[in-house]
Amino acid sequence: MSLKSLEKETELPFDEYVLNDKWRHKYTPIDTYFKFHQQAIENLESFWESVAKELEWFKPWDKVLDASNPPFYKWFVGGRLNLSYLAVDRHVKTWRKNKLAIEWEGEPLDESGYPIDRRKLTYYDLFREVNRVACMLKCNFGVKKGDRVTLYLPMVPELPITMLAAWRIGAITNVVFSGFSADALAERINDSQSRIVITADGFWRRGKVVRLKEVVDSALEKAPGVENVIVLPRLGLKDVPMTEGRDFWWNRLMQGIPPNTYIEPEPVESEHPSFILYTSGTTGKPKGIVHDTGGWAVHVYATMKWVFDIRDDDIYWCTADIGWVTGHSYVVLGPLLMGTTEIIYEGAPDYPQPDRWWSIIERYGVTILYTSPTAIRMFMRYGEAWPGKHDLSTLRIIHSVGEPINPEAWRWAYRVLGNEKVAFGSTWWMTETGGIVISHAPGLYLVPMKPGTNGPPLPGFEVDVVDENGNPVPPGVKGYLVIKKPWPGMLHGIWGDPERYVKTYWSRFPGMFYVGDYAIKDKDGYIWVLGRADEVIKVAGHRLGTYELESAFVAHPAVAEAAVVGVPDAIKGEVPIAFVVLKQGVTPTEELRKELREHIRKSIGPIAEPAQIFFVTKLPKTRSGKIMRRLLKAVATGAPLGDVTTLEDETSVEEAKKAYEELKAEMAGP
């Protein structure tokens, strides 16, 4: 069946151009930008080579791009480098030696509202710690080039330190998000064939202790290949189970390693894997996405410069958990490659009060904020008073990541957080791309902003929107997002499964990388990513994207957040239902429910009218802020909930169940 546009797309502001005086000196005409972009595409290898030369290589490459065996592309073939050296050593040789690299804040606050746990690390501190941990891995446990090291750690400085230490000796990191279950952890350990795991006794989350070591112990019952476990005493718990001969305390190991220890960085090949990161598919077991070293470094370095316009006095904060790819690229590697100062925070965004993030921005003078649309929508619900209590005037750039941002959330953040003076962009990329692909780029050429768009593709990335047959669609028509040429940060494959790599990404449209997202390209060349193509509700043959419906809900002045899922229907095949969180002070009524139905009919069309609307006070989300729509669908269909270990707040599911049962009973009548 051919892909059809909706009768009426969600109202997207294709022609709403936002300018502000603070950035006027940076503005570039759209056609000027695309001329530069086209030149980069036509001279792809020389373009990326010029970027790569800005980094230090132990040995230069012999060939920029080896395309002899597509889709197994190789970048900077013959070149040798080391990520730890690039992120730490080279700064220690300069004035940045005593510059702050990381300011870390734990979740607990004292009675005055000041953080109890704070740490500051200069680039020299980081250099010393990375070398000591590299020695711990290499000298104590024999970790060598190519070995996989699994890290199951919270958001503490030891996580980026250990990643850099592993890369220093040529090991491959396998970071597992600390919210994953024992089964999920075991699966990732086994697939990567890790023989060492690094974890912590626990950490703070919403004022509660989350124990980690016990999860590791349960996982290792199903992962017999692990020989050693290193345990960081984050909380100093006294009752942590330790297996003699296998488990070791981090601090005791480090006591035997002198502060001036130096481990020579391993000069690894450009195509040497730096990390494996597992990402869930719609079917089957998680995919172990593999990224190389040289191409990934060049991609992340370039996009940090272009997208974030890094300056020497910036205080940068990416709120992502390091267990996700955003944390790998834009918490660990990117800011340290640039020699900037960054914030790392352990806890929940709205604990103990909804202004926790705003207090952090004010306390440290954050200038660049990189966060998620889900977080922005959550803060919208709390209202403008909370950010209004704090001085956010240091912010000059805000970017979002992780999912499409609806225009209403964009406008709110731009006005309330940025005081209409920031450069604001919605970046698009994914685990497989390794770094940002589509975004406004205030560090390069800043074209006019549009609320809700991802902006134009960055230089060196040939992005298009195509139909079912792989042909480009006209401006304003929905299609599939693809990348037409290889790029440096692209995945190196799927760990141990090259056939799955080809089938998943390269078979749908031969010669093009299939992203799996719907998108629209407007007449100016800006890309509007609409969400996953598999997050589609098919109503009587019409395809409705969940993003389109949710954006329409949030555009209503009473709505803070919304999640839409499809449920089976005997006549239409499938119909949408919505779980809606109202703004504070708004009362849920039947009249409002009718008003929202009519609002959706007007915004999208009668075909999109939800069969049911449930009012809830919270949506089920992961700790990284992503809405767990599958749980809502399970509630509505009576299906098993499945794995809920990444769920931030279990009461959100119970509330959804209650709302569903109450409305169902009400509709059934006496």
From Swiss-Prot:
CoA binds at R205, R206, G207, K208, T326, R601. It comes from the Archaea. Keywords: Acetylation, ATP-binding, Ligase, Magnesium, Metal-binding, Nucleotide-binding. Pfam families: ACAS_N, AMP-binding, AMP-binding_C. GO terms for biological process: acetyl-CoA biosynthetic process from acetate. It catalyses: acetate + ATP + CoA = acetyl-CoA + AMP + diphosphate. Acetylated. Deacetylation by the SIR2-homolog deacetylase activates the enzyme. The modification N6-acetyllysine is found at K626. Its EC number is 6.2.1.1. Belongs to the ATP-dependent AMP-binding enzyme family. This is Acetyl-coenzyme A synthetase. It comes from Pyrobaculum arsenaticum (strain DSM 13514 / JCM 11321 / PZ6).
